[in-house]
Amino acid sequence: MARQVGHHNNVDHLREVYGELHIAHGVVMGNHSLELRRHDYPTDLFHYCVGLDSSLLEDESRVIPDLPDRVEAHLRRDNCCGVKLYPGYNKIALSDPMYQPIYRLAARYGKPVAVHMGLTAFSRAHLKYCHPLALDEVAADHPDTQFVMCHFGNPFLEAAAAVVEKNPNVAADLSGLLEGRVDLDAYFREQAGYVFLLRTWLTAIQCWDKVMFGTDWPIVNLGEYIGFIRQLVPETHWEPVFFDNANRIYGLGL
């Protein structure tokens, strides 16, 4: 996928591109393994969120032995800045008992729980589990846990905006709103209605202290996506959206 958007999937390439585009740091949304050794990233470039995805579930029992202990081993690490959940793909409600210890651990360590919200890449996933209202429920029940709504719940923008505005412990990122290479001038012309809705709800809630830049790389070209978000977000809010909010919410210490 990286090659299709003009990139190479290796650290040297990303280091070069980060320098060219003045990207200070990245957060890797990890998946496929809870093994500590599988999450070895250059600390000058990346922090990571440890992911709990469907590949970790054993048969149909939805049981991961010692899950809280294994997640806590990551949260103890300085370079682990949170947890990533994929409820639509796992087909497990965010309110499921298996997740409750994870929310408490995240609160204890002061690290956020990022959640895939909105449209899924595979048709067999269940949207009801990744609708923004599912996040509202657990955010309200776990007020001491910081949550991040990934992809701004796209395309459920109205509900996403309501959940971010209502819950002080819910932030959102703007990753994954595009896919592939994009001619931005043509896109903003042809998708004017969609862009209008995005701008409308982002502007309506005025939660610019809780909205973060993100990419969902490698599905987008980094330079093009930065240009997309710059056209979407008013320039007066670029500093918090592109840097300050993520640095604070993920505790990056930059």
State where each predicted segment sits.
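Generic structural signal for well-ordered alpha-helices
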Residues: 11-15, 34-39, 68-72, 99, ...
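Divalent metal-coordination and catalytic microenvironments
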Residues: 18, 26, 48, 83, ...
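Acidic/histidine-rich helix-loop elements
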Residues: 1-7, 58, 182-187
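Mid-to-C-terminal alpha-helical segments outside catalytic/metal-binding sites
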Residues: 1-25, 199-200, 204-212, 219-254
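Catalytic pocket-lining loop regions of alpha/beta-barrel enzymes
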Residues: 95-212
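Short, well-ordered alpha-helical microsegments
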Residues: 33-37, 156-160, 222-223
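Active-site gating/metal-coordination segments in enzymes
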Residues: 24-25, 32-129
